[in-house]
């Protein structure tokens, strides 16, 4: 069953999708990582919520520059503290 999105998650998702549809094709492929930074942000916000997901996405975007080697960098899994 799908979890309901908060209004901030919904807004962030729409802004990122707008970037992917309208801006990214103009700029061309430049991301050094897989998944791309925008797909990483979508997944992080979906999995961890707006605040923590935005934190992960911001850290990832700051790493995306020519001096970083890039490569495979998946979203960290959500820790379920109730099961520990």
From Swiss-Prot:
InterPro entries: Membr_insert_effic_factor_YidD. The keyword Cell inner membrane applies. Keywords: Cell inner membrane, Cell membrane, Membrane. Pfam families: YidD (PF01809). It comes from the Bacteria. Its main location: membrane. It is a peripheral membrane protein. Could be involved in insertion of integral membrane proteins into the membrane. This is Putative membrane protein insertion efficiency factor.
């Amino acid at each position: 069953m799908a979890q309901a999105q908060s209004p901030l998650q919904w807004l962030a998702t729409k802004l990122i999708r707008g970037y992917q549809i309208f801006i990214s094709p103009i700029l061309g492929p430049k991301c050094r990582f897989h998944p791309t930074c925008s797909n990483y942000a979508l997944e992080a916000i979906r999995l961890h919520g707006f605040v923590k997901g935005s934190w992960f996405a911001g850290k990832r975007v700051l790493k995306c520059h020519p001096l970083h080697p890039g490569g495979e960098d998946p979203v960290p899994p959500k820790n379920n503290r109730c099961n520990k």
